[in-house]
């Protein structure tokens, strides 16, 4: 909404792009913005893990690179990509398992799985994004999570970060911004079995986090928010402001 207003007031996309290009790019990568590429069914997330520079990004599932306009949030100019073929079987197995999980738990969710060599280590990085924007109902919300592990030895450390951001602004302004860091051990065996355990750990961690958030909100509603509510006056009745002039205080105010 704010961006659209600024764009309308400025009425110059070139100037807006020049002045805020870096901010838009960083925002889209931080927020795991979904992108739809013409000719391909599945969306891909815009993340730092797929950033190739010069506004080009990697779509590892479709094995292409593409150009992304951060201002218009439009993808274009897809080209085939054959990088990191050594990790293809691992990436594909984790992607297949994660897609099934996201489809079941996040109706509007998108996931992207990368197979990368980081500091000489073969690494799987998985990103999940799901959002619901309801500006007409005065609320918006987004879920993001990122998980990574290295393929080395019989066990590895699975590291994750979970993020929730919700904004409700009807007759008030309430925001929830929360994140949680997770570390779990994962057994490295065959691709399919590792992918299965990978998703099992993700499902448990994300479920526990969402349950904890819900329980915390219930506790706050029963305690913190209740304490903030305006108490009734000593008469134990609300003032009818439409009849204020019929009250003694209203007449005194009128005669003042």
UniProtKB/Swiss-Prot annotation:
Localization: Cytoplasm, Cytoskeleton
InterPro entries per the UniProt record, alphabetical: CapZ_alpha (IPR002189), CapZ_alpha/beta (IPR037282), CapZ_alpha/beta_2 (IPR042276), CapZ_alpha_1 (IPR042489), F-actin_cap_asu_CS (IPR017865)
GO molecular-function terms, A-Z: actin filament binding
Predominant location: cytoplasm
Taxonomy, superkingdom: Eukaryota
One family name in Pfam for this protein: F-actin_cap_A
GO CC annotations, alphabetized: cortical cytoskeleton; F-actin capping protein complex; WASH complex
Keywords: Actin-binding, Cytoplasm, Cytoskeleton
GO BP terms in the entry: actin cytoskeleton organization; barbed-end actin filament capping; cell junction assembly
Gene3D superfamilies from the UniProt entry: F-actin capping protein, alpha subunit, F-actin capping protein, beta subunit
Subunit record text: Component of the F-actin capping complex, composed of a heterodimer of an alpha and a beta subunit. Subunit of dynactin, a multiprotein complex part of a tripartite complex with dynein and a adapter, such as BICDL1, BICD2 or HOOK3. The dynactin complex is built around ACTR1A/ACTB filament and consists of an actin-related filament composed of a shoulder domain, a pointed end and a barbed end. Its length is defined by its flexible shoulder domain. The soulder is composed of 2 DCTN1 subunits, 4 DCTN2 and 2 DCTN3.
Functional summary from the UniProt entry: F-actin-capping proteins bind in a Ca(2+)-independent manner to the fast growing ends of actin filaments (barbed end) thereby blocking the exchange of subunits at these ends. Unlike other capping proteins (such as gelsolin and severin), these proteins do not sever actin filaments. May play a role in the formation of epithelial cell junctions. Forms, with CAPZB, the barbed end of the fast growing ends of actin filaments in the dynactin complex and stabilizes dynactin structure.
Family: Belongs to the F-actin-capping protein alpha subunit family.
This protein's name: F-actin-capping protein subunit alpha-1
Organism of this sequence: Xenopus laevis (African clawed frog)
Lineage, uppermost ranks: Eukaryota, Metazoa, Chordata, Craniata, Vertebrata
């Amino acid at each position: 909404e704010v961006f659209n207003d600024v764009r309308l007031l400025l009425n110059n996309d070139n100037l807006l792009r020049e002045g805020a290009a870096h901010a838009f790019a960083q925002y889209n990568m931080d927020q795991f913005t979904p992108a739809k590429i013409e000719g391909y069914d599945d969306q891909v997330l815009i993340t730092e893990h797929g950033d190739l520079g010069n506004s080009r990004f990697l779509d590892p599932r479709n094995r292409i690179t593409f150009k992304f306009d951060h201002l218009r949030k439009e993808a274009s100019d897809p080209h085939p990509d054959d990088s990191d073929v050594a990790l293809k079987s691992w990436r594909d197995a984790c992607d297949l398992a994660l897609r099934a999980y996201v489809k079941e738990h996040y109706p509007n969710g998108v996931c992207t799985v990368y197979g990368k060599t980081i500091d000489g280590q073969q690494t799987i990085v998985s990103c999940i994004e799901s959002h619901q924007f309801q500006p007409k109902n005065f609320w918006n919300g987004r879920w993001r999570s990122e998980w990574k592990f290295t393929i080395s030895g019989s066990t590895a450390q699975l590291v994750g970060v979970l993020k929730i951001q919700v904004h409700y602004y009807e007759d008030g302004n309430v925001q929830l911004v929360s994140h949680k860091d997770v570390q779990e051990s994962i057994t490295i065996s065959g691709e399919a079995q590792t992918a299965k355990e990978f998703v099992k750990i993700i499902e448990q961690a994300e479920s526990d986090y969402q349950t904890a958030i819900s329980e915390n909100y219930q506790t706050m509603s029963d305690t913190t928010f209740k304490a903030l509510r305006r108490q009734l006056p000593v008469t134990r009745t609300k003032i009818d402001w439409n009849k204020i002039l019929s009250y003694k205080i209203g007449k005194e105010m009128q005669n003042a």
